[in-house]
Amino acid sequence: MGLADDKNTILVIDRSTDTQSVALVKDGQIFPRVFAGEDARSGDWPLKVRDFLASRGVAPGELDQIVVGQGPGSFAGIRAALAFAQGLALGSHAEVFGLPSTLALTRDNAKVAVVGDARRDRYWVTLYDGVHTVKDFFLVRKEELGGAVPDGFAVVTPDGHRIDSLLRDHYGPRYAGALTPLAAHLAEVAVGHPDLLRSEPLPVYLQAAVRTS
């Protein structure tokens, strides 16, 4: 996957869903890797990431940046990804940044509403115009979903296994379906829009019920 020329070597990690992924930005190219099923839940996941870097000829000390998807999503997954990134950065010059995982579901020149299950009969919503935030994360009740998304916005969710039918009922043809936030797409944002990177990243928590694992 090609990019505009970029000299930084960047590792991007997203563990906000059951489909967990990494991507390496090197020499203007994005190299993705997806861990699913047992690979995603395995305790040796950090070793698999190190093996992935080695397969691309990159030592942890050669990384310039590490970017982590901040969620919303799996409490354990996001925390583990941040801890891994901070540990990997120790003893190197790599900087650790964050991006909301929902940015992986945006597209250039498209208005997108990302809706997720916050549990306890609440749903989180965030609105984007391209990669730019129109309205940051906010919580709504089920009966408020219809009015939460303005006309002209397509609706997507990373939580299709839980709320796909609900969103179809509320949004009809505006509902574009379930999408998985992948590190490769976050890498595109990180390189194309470095101004969006967040230093000293923390997980996006909307309420305790967002913790999914």
Predicted regions, residues:
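DPxDG-like acidic metal-binding loop motif
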Residues: 65-95
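A generic, residue-level signal for flexible/boundary positions that often mark functional hotspots
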Residues: 52-53, 69, 93-96, 195, ...
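Oxyanion-binding and handling regions
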Residues: 1-30, 36, 40-44, 97-213
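Phosphate/pyrophosphate-binding loops at sites that engage ATP/ADP/AMP, CoA/4′-phosphopantetheine
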Residues: 49-65, 148-153
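Generic structural marker for isolated residues within well-ordered, non-membrane alpha-helices
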Residues: 49, 85, 164
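Phosphate-handling active-site elements
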Residues: 57-61, 90-99
